[in-house]
């Protein structure tokens, strides 16, 4: 793995990895790879030592690749579902809980009657199950909704 901050992208690169998922899914731009975005975050000053990827990267990186970002402190379940139905993708900054003991970024890309579909760049297990709104909303600290 490419170095990222005090570790490598496989361990602490959830922010750039989530952005790569969103950018590719919405634009099909294959230049926006996790290692490329991690390098952009490092050189652009979006990596905060001891913390990880700055939240501002989630807006600035999207804009650089022609993706529209809207940032929210929270969304109601119906708002989350509406945005997903409209073809948007969502990144959440998660606090301590099911996804991490500290902070972590995940992608919400769909929902079914069983719950929300998540891509967790650090956990295949978390990505393989459905998540209910109450669990997600009790742990997120910030939400970005992305549109092409």
Please annotate each region the language model reported.
Residues 111-148:
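Noncatalytic regulatory segments and standalone regulatory/sensor domains
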Residues 63, 84-85, 137:
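Alpha-helix boundary recognition
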Residues 15-23, 34, 38, 55-62, ...:
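Extracytoplasmic/secreted envelope proteins and their assembly/folding machinery
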Residues 21, 28, 43-48, 75-78, ...:
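Solvent-exposed loop/turn segments at secondary-structure junctions
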Residues 68-117:
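Active-site-adjacent substructure of cysteine-protease-like catalytic cores
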Residues 32-34, 39-73:
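Mid-length scaffold segments of soluble, non-membrane domains
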Residues 1-48:
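Active-site-adjacent structural segments surrounding the nucleophilic cysteine of cysteine proteases
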């Amino acid at each position: 793995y490419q170095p990222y901050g005090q570790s490598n992208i496989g361990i602490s690169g959830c922010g750039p990895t989530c952005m790569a998922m969103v950018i590719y899914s919405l634009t099909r731009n294959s230049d926006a790879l996790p290692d490329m975005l991690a390098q952009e975050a490092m050189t652009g000053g979006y990596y905060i030592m001891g913390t990880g990827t700055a939240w501002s990267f989630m807006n600035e990186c999207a804009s650089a690749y022609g993706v529209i970002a809207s940032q929210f402190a929270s969304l109601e379940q119906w708002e989350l579902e509406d945005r997903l139905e409209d073809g948007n993708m969502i990144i959440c900054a998660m606090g301590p809980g099911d996804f991490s003991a500290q902070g972590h970024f995940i992608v919400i890309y769909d929902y079914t009657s069983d719950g929300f579909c998540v891509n967790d760049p650090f956990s295949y297990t978390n990505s393989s199950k459905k998540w209910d709104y109450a669990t997600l909303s009790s742990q997120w600290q910030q939400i970005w909704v992305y549109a092409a």
